[in-house]
C-alpha cells in the first residue's frame, strides 16, 4: 500500500489527469505533463480564468493554433491565423444564453497563445471574452488517453 501511495504522489508531481465533459475534442480523458512546453498543433492544458460560463481554475484542454507573433485576422466572423482558417465565431452560445463577440484582428502578444478546436461550439480564443491565453495559466502539454 505504501508503494502505491508513493507512486501516486510522484505521478501527481509530474502529471495532471482531467476529464473532458464537452464534445469540443474527441477524447474524454487527458493527461497533462506539467511544465512541458507546447508548440503550435499540440494539445495544451490550461487554467480557465472564469471569463464566462465556467468557474475560474477549471482545467481546459484545447489545441494550440497560434503562438506569439502570429497574426489573427477576422473576416466577417471567420478567424484566420497566418492565413490558415481556424473556424467561424458564432454570434451566440449553443444554448442561446450568451452573446459572443469575435476576437479582434491582432498580432498574438508575447507570452500568449491562441487555443481552439475544430468543433463549431468550442468556447475558445475565437471569442473576445476568452481571447489569447497567457502562458502563466498553461499547465503543460496534454495527451489524449481515451
Q: Which residue ranges define each predicted feature?
A:
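Mid-length scaffold segments of soluble, non-membrane domains
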Residues: 55-86
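Short, surface-exposed secondary-structure boundary micro-motifs
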Residues: 35, 49, 77, 118-119
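Structural motif
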Residues: 39-44, 70, 112, 118
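Short, exposed beta-strand/loop patches in secreted or surface proteins that constitute
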Residues: 21-23, 64, 71-72, 105-106
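Protein maturation boundaries and topogenic segments
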Residues: 1-59, 107, 128-146
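Acidic/glycine-rich C-terminal interaction modules and beta/coil loop segments
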Residues: 89, 95-142
Amino acid at each position: 500500500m505504501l508503494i502505491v501511495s508513493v507512486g501516486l504522489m510522484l505521478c501527481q508531481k509530474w502529471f495532471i489527469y482531467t476529464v473532458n465533459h464537452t464534445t469540443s475534442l474527441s477524447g474524454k480523458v487527458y493527461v497533462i505533463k506539467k511544465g512541458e512546453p507546447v508548440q503550435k498543433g499540440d494539445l495544451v492544458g490550461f487554467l480557465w480564468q472564469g471569463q464566462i460560463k465556467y468557474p475560474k481554475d477549471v482545467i481546459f484542454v484545447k489545441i494550440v493554433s497560434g503562438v506569439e507573433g502570429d497574426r489573427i485576422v477576422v473576416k466577417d466572423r471567420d478567424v484566420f491565423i497566418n492565413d490558415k482558417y481556424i473556424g467561424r465565431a458564432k454570434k451566440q452560445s449553443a444554448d442561446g444564453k450568451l452573446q459572443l463577440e469575435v476576437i479582434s484582428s491582432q498580432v498574438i502578444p508575447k507570452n500568449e497563445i491562441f487555443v481552439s478546436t475544430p468543433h463549431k461550439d468550442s468556447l475558445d480564443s475565437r471569442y473576445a471574452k476568452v481571447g489569447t491565453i497567457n502562458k502563466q495559466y498553461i499547465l503543460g502539454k496534454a495527451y489524449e488517453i481515451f
